[in-house]
């Protein structure tokens, strides 16, 4: 049974339970298989690029919308050594529809819907909602986490500047 972290995050002040470990900078990034927009299995790890993994509960909510659009804008300024991946428990079809409707084309969207494998491995699976909580992980080319943020209040935005700074530093290393 996966570890449960009661009260690890809140939604509008109400405590929620996260399933899985709390990962920190320096930890090895677990691999997890997610679905892409074509329903193909896709690994969260990338051997040749630094990855900013932006985790959102659902693209169809206001803060998740803002977060994903913000990272799409930032992706154009990061260069070829860094890629941004958005993970949510939305169906892959919903992710494709949302990206198309919002002109989001520089972020890779991957779905954790099938097994919540990513959520369980990265400690972002919200037990009460079967969604992933808001978080950001930066993973270097060697598969090490160099930045991790679990946003305490799901309705708040993450620290974009800290994640982007960590990604740029990892790409320059």
Segments predicted by a language model, with ranges:
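Chalcogenol-based redox active-site neighborhoods
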Residues: 1-173
């Amino acid at each position: 049974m996966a570890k449960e972290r009661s009260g690890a995050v809140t939604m509008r002040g109400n405590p929620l339970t996260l399933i899985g470990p709390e990962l920190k900078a320096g930890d090895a990034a677990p691999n997890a298989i997610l679905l892409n927009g074509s329903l193909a299995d896709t690994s969260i790890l990338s051997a040749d690029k630094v990855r900013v993994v932006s985790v959102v509960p659902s693209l169809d909510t206001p803060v998740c919308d803002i977060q994903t659009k913000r990272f799409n804008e930032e992706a154009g300024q990061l260069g070829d050594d860094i890629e941004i991946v958005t993970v949510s428990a939305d169906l892959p079809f919903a992710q494709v529809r949302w990206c198309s409707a919002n002109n989001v084309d520089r972020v890779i969207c991957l779905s954790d819907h099938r097994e919540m494998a990513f959520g369980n491995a990265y400690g972002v699976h919200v037990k009460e909602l079967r969604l992933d909580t808001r978080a950001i992980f930066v993973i270097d080319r060697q598969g090490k986490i160099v930045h991790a943020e679990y946003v305490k209040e799901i309705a708040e935005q993450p620290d974009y500047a800290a994640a982007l700074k960590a990604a740029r530093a990892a790409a320059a290393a």
